[in-house]
Amino acid sequence: MLDERAKMLLKTLVERYIADGQPVGSRTLSKTSGLELSPATIRNVMSDLEELGLIASPHTSAGRIPTARGYRLFVDSMLTSRAFAREVADTGSAPLLQPDQPKRVIANAAQLLSSLSQFVGVVTVPKKPSVFRHMEFLRLGERRVLLILVSPDGDVQNRVLFTAHDYTQSQLVEATNYLNAHYAGLSIEGVRERLKLEVDALRGEIGTLMQAAVQAGTEAVNEDTEQLIVSGERNLLGVQDFGSDMGSIRKMFDLFEQKTQLLRLLDGSSRADGVRIYIGGESGVVPIEELSVVSAPYEVDGQVVGTLGVIGPTRMAYERMIQIVDITSRLVGNALSQKQG
């Protein structure tokens, strides 16, 4: 357990290092901590903090820098809240405040997180079943039919079907009316199962067309399963902490390209109550010691449907990132709830 003096020195050291990116020495702490302590006394306290694994000494400097464990103690017990909502509101958040297509809201959110943090913004796409609200067939020409799929939230997808039979427009209207009367509101898979039972009762050509529509709908859903939107990866190239460490840079870009590990981490964060912070490799999922993740779930009508966050160096302004993530999660939830309403 640290005494108040040690806590204050650790807090000051972390804040100075976050601000400057340079190892912090005892003289700097003596001037900025507000404690009337000699540099010698401060050196003794720093030695104790180092033994506890809270700070470390780079080989090239007499100063100290925080470790992941030191950052964790700082985040858990030393942050203070400051007003930040107006900066978010005044920095391009307007698109998020408007009900819009979910894809556009999610893309805007990732860009907003990246813009405000100057790091990487990530947002998982809302989880939803592959339900359709309306389906329509239009004749394009001989043996070519346009299938229009409309989801409950207004997303529209078009697919061209190449058919073995040349359907008239009246046949297509008949199939459209039947599908919408009997299957609207079901998932694509639900429609498939119902058709298996009912296809014999339908005229052969119409049944075949409906089966083709279900197959096209399945393909459309599978193509539209991008689960994670990432924005601002290149921002990390300008972070001095990574310097010319090509190994770390390569790992980072593999992480953003493959997305699997990030999705596992963010899915775990969806069960958190508010903002959650992973420092360095402590998540066990993102295997990069130099990266931290600040994340929070977002809700639609009281139900958690996704997670968003900021990914940056362990030397980040955690207080600021927490508020960026917290406020953005609320903006996204509001925009999506209004859209569904």
Curated annotation (Swiss-Prot):
InterPro entries: GAF-like_dom_sf (IPR029016), HrcA (IPR002571), HrcA_C (IPR021153), WH-like_DNA-bd_sf (IPR036388), WH_DNA-bd_sf (IPR036390), WHTH_HrcA_DNA-bd (IPR005104). One of its GO terms (biological process) is negative regulation of DNA-templated transcription. The keyword Nucleus does not apply. One of its GO terms (molecular function) is DNA binding. Keywords: Repressor, Stress response, Transcription, Transcription regulation. Pfam families: HrcA (PF01628), HrcA_DNA-bdg (PF03444). Belongs to the HrcA family. Negative regulator of class I heat shock genes (grpE-dnaK-dnaJ and groELS operons). Prevents heat-shock induction of these operons. HAMAP family: HrcA. This is Heat-inducible transcription repressor HrcA. It comes from Leptothrix cholodnii (strain ATCC 51168 / LMG 8142 / SP-6). The gene is hrcA.
